[in-house]
From Swiss-Prot:
InterPro entries xref list: Tobamovirus_resist_UPF0261, UPF0261, UPF0261_C, UPF0261_N
Protein name, as recorded: UPF0261 protein BPP1817
Organism name: Bordetella parapertussis (strain 12822 / ATCC BAA-587 / NCTC 13253)
Pfam family membership, one: UPF0261
Protein origin, superkingdom: Bacteria
Amino acid sequence: MQEIEQRIYLAATYDTKGEEAEYLRQLLRRDGVMVVTVDVATSGQGSPAMVSAQEVAACYPQGAQAVFTGERGSAIVAMALAFERYLAGQRDVGAVLGIGGSGGTALVTPAMRALPVGVPKLMVSTMASGNVAPYVGPSDIAMMYSVTDVAGLNRISRRVLANAAGAIAGAFRQARQPIADDGRPAVGITMFGVTTPCVQHVTAALHDRYDCLVFHATGTGGQSMEKLADSGLLAGVLDLTTTEVCDFLFGGVLACTDDRFGAIARSGVPYVGSCGALDMVNFGALDTVPAACRERLLYPHNPQVTLMRTTAQENARQGAWIAERLNRCEGQVRFLIPEGGVSALDAPGQAFYDEAADAALFQALYDHVRQTDRRRLVRVPCHINDPLFARAAVEQFHEISQ
């Protein structure tokens, strides 16, 4: 079968960003790469783009007329879905470059997020110097701040856009080069600073047989790992640090979504999990901690991160929440209970050591997980960062992944 020539897809709302889009197209063509320009404007006006807004909007489930309603908010949401579906139907997508303000960024990035990890994605945006998590999510989108507004060409915007063109062209070429693959299957592992010793022991034990992909449990970290599991790219998961659940349930800043553990249930991938850092909720700097939490047990992890110790009642709630999701998993599941503590701070003499709070967490898991031959809780009578715990996790993983 003849190989399909890959192209860079350049997306912009041509009614407001057409001048910048055409400038980028010329730069990319001069660089020798094939470009497909796509108009994602919601105004319905004509444009010189190779793919018209009408063609993109036709991919919306309710049709183009449901996109061009004249109501900006709903039109952006509809066109975003239409562009995602349009892009998913193209077999020659070698990279995607987007430009936009707040609306354009919200419109283009969902389609980028839906593409596989490794396909270059660059968004030049006025929003790129703020909180970009809603745009990037668990994907590998690169965000470039536009400095000036994307509202015409000037000496600053020309330079920034030229850099963006060079960056995406370079990534496009690099993505077509083979990457050395030693044949080891990949496993996903979750880690936090306070579970680092555990994960270091685990990766050292697995390294010879597996390509260990370690994900920082920052909310998007867990989502990234589960995205790979959903894509069939992981041979197994060692979800040793499930702390994102604390933030989701109790208002922290590093929260997972309600779909945490969903990819494990959908994929059936061999899964070893544990309670890593379920003793803490993450906030920003100390002065950002919500007023209702100011009298709680707080620990300044660093100037930008403040940790709040979970209570026995909160632990019982999150134990039940995790159990309910583990019960949906029909693949091989082993969830380890580190009876000596769940983080570096949850150890004798440390700030968060609380045997009663931990006991509430463990008991909730025992009370609510429906154990079967394939779904088991495993009691480990040591601290999570003890080498013996790591050994137990590795042994359980080997047992279920044969």
